[in-house]
C-alpha cells in the first residue's frame, strides 16, 4: 500500500565490483561491460548530475536532447524532460517504457518517481496499457513482485464480503432484538468499508506498475482513501458499542468527531505530499491517531463503571489490535527484505552518493552466488514486508468484527455482566 517518490534512498544495490571499504561502507568504482568497454563510475555520474542541478537551479534549466532527438528542457534536479511541447515525463521514462514492453525491470531501471522499496530489486512492472495491468492480476506476463500483494487482499475482500452477506445476517447479535439498530448498522457498515478497503488496495497494487504517473498517483489516493474508511468505521463501531448504554450524547459526539477526522484524512490523502516516502511517519501517525480515538471510549467506560467493566475492551485488544500492531512493525521496518544477502547492498551516505541513487543503470545489481533460503533471494516475489502487512491487516479486520460481536454480547445479550 505507496507512489510518486522524492526521497533519497540511503541504501542501494551496486551493479559492479565493490571498492575497498571506507568507514564500513562500500563505494562504486569504474565498471566494464561484457565487451570490455569502460563505464563511468557512479561517483562521476553523480557529480555530473550535481553540476546539472547547480546549473538548472541557477539558470532556470538546461538544453538537452530528447529521446526523439529533438531539443527539450531539463527541469531542476528531479530531471523531468519536456519535448516539443509534449507532456512532461520523468527523466529516463522513455528508456524504462521501452524495456518494460518486453520484460519486468529491476529497481534501477525504473524512473526515480517509481522507486519505492529499495530492497525489492527484481520483478517490477512498467506497463504501457491498462489491459496489461489488469491481466497482470493473473500473471499473464509472468510472476511479479505485486502478485501476492494483489491476491492477499483479493482473498481478504472475499472473506469480508462473505461475512457481510452471509455470516453477519445469521449471527445472534444481528438477530437479537436487544441490540439497538445503530449498533447493527455500525457493524454492517464496518464490514462494507472493509470490503471497500481491500478492493481499493487491489486496484492500487494492480495499477502501480503502469508507466502513466498521473494514473498511478490517482490509484494510490484510492488506496489511502480505502484505509481511511476502514479505520473510521472501526472507531465508529467501538464507540457505538461501548458508549451507547452509558451516554448517548457522548457517543454521538465521538462518532461525529471520528467521521470528521476521517473526512479530513480522506481529503489529505489526495495531496501529493502525503504519498512521499518521507511522509511515511506522518501516514502512520494519522492512521494510528485516528484509531486511538476509539480507545477514548474505553476511558469513559472506566470513568463511569471503573474496572468492573474493563474486560469489555479486552476482545478488541487480543483479537484485533495486536494484529495491526505486528503489521505496522513490518510496514515501517521493511523486514525481512532489508536483511537479504543475495545482492550487494550499499550503505554509504553523502551528497555524491545521494545523487548516484537517482541514476538509471543498465546493469542489474551484482548477484552473489549465495542462493540459499536464508539469503532471502525470494523476498522480491514472496513474503516481503508489504505482503506481511496485508496479511496482518486482514487478520486485524476479521478480528475487529469478532471482537465487536463479543462486546455486543457482553453489553446486550449477557445481562448484568457488563454494567
UniProtKB/Swiss-Prot annotation:
Annotated localization: Endoplasmic reticulum membrane
Transmembrane segments: 148-168, 185-205, 226-246, 250-270, 284-304, 312-332, 378-398
Pfam entry (one): HlyIII
Glycosylation sites noted in the Swiss-Prot or TrEMBL record: 145, 208
Lumenal side stretches: 1-147, 206-225, 271-283, 333-377
Record topology, Cytoplasmic segments: 169-184, 247-249, 305-311, 399-419
GO cellular component: endoplasmic reticulum membrane
A GO biological-process term: intracellular zinc ion homeostasis
Keyword Acetylation: no
Region (Disordered) location: 1-65
Topology class, membrane: Multi-pass membrane protein
Function, in words: ADIPOR-like receptor involved in zinc metabolism either by altering membrane sterol content or by directly altering cellular zinc levels.
Family recorded in the similarity comment: Belongs to the ADIPOR family.
Protein name as it appears in the record: ADIPOR-like receptor IZH3
Organism name: Eremothecium gossypii (strain ATCC 10895 / CBS 109.51 / FGSC 9923 / NRRL Y-1056) (Yeast)
Gene: IZH3
Amino acid at each position: 500500500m505507496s507512489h510518486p517518490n522524492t526521497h533519497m534512498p540511503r541504501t542501494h544495490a551496486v551493479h559492479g565490483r565493490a571498492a575497498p571499504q571506507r568507514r564500513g561502507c562500500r563505494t562504486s568504482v569504474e565498471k566494464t561491460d561484457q565487451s570490455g568497454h569502460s563505464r563511468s563510475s557512479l561517483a562521476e555520474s553523480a557529480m555530473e548530475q550535481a553540476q546539472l542541478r547547480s546549473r538548472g537551479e541557477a539558470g532556470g534549466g538546461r538544453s538537452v536532447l530528447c529521446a526523439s532527438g529533438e531539443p527539450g528542457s531539463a527541469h531542476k534536479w528531479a530531471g523531468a524532460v519536456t519535448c516539443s511541447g509534449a507532456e512532461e515525463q520523468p527523466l529516463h521514462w522513455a528508456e524504462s517504457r521501452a524495456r518494460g514492453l518486453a520484460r519486468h525491470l529491476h529497481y534501477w531501471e525504473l524512473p526515480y518517481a517509481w522507486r519505492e522499496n529499495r530492497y525489492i530489486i527484481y520483478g517490477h512492472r512498467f506497463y504501457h496499457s491498462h489491459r496489461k495491468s489488469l491481466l497482470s492480476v493473473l500473471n499473464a506476463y509472468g510472476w511479479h513482485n505485486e502478485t501476492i500483494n494483489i491476491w492477499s487482499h483479493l482473498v481478504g475482500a472475499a472473506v469480508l464480503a462473505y461475512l457481510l452477506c452471509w455470516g453477519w445476517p445469521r449471527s445472534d447479535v444481528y438477530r437479537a432484538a436487544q441490540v439497538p439498530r445503530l449498533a447493527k448498522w455500525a457493524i454492517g457498515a464496518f464490514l462494507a468499508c472493509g470490503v471497500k478497503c481491500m478492493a481499493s488496495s487491489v486496484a492500487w497494487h494492480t495499477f502501480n506498475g503502469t508507466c502513466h504517473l498521473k494514473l498511478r498517483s490517482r490509484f494510490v489516493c484510492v488506496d489511502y482513501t480505502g484505509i481511511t474508511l476502514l479505520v473510521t468505521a472501526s472507531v465508529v463501531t467501538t464507540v457505538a458499542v461501548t458508549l451507547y448504554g452509558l451516554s448517548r450524547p457522548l457517543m454521538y459526539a465521538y462518532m461525529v468527531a471520528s467521521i470528521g477526522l476521517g473526512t479530513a484524512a480522506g481529503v489529505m490523502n489526495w495531496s501529493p505530499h502525503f504519498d512521499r516516502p518521507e511522509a511515511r511517519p506522518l501516514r502512520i501517525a494519522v492512521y494510528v491517531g485516528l484509531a486511538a480515538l476509539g480507545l477514548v471510549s474505553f476511558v469513559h467506560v472506566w470513568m463511569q463503571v471503573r474496572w468492573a467493566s474493563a474486560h469489555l475492551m479486552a476482545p478488541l485488544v487480543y483479537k484485533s489490535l495486536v494484529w495491526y500492531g505486528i503489521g505496522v512493525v513490518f510496514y515501517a521496518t521493511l523486514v525481512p527484505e532489508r536483511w537479504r544477502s543475495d545482492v550487494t547492498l550499499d550503505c554509504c551516505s553523502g551528497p555524491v552518493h545521494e545523487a548516484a541513487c537517482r541514476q538509471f543503470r543498465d546493469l542489474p545489481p551484482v548477484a552473489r552466488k549465495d542462493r540459499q533460503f536464508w539469503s532471502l533471494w525470494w523476498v522480491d516475489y514472496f513474503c516481503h514486508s508489504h505482503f506481511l502487512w496485508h496479511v496482518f491487516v486482514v487478520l486485524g479486520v476479521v478480528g475487529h468484527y469478532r471482537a465487536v460481536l463479543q462486546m455486543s454480547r457482553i453489553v446486550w445479550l449477557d445481562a448484568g455482566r457488563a454494567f
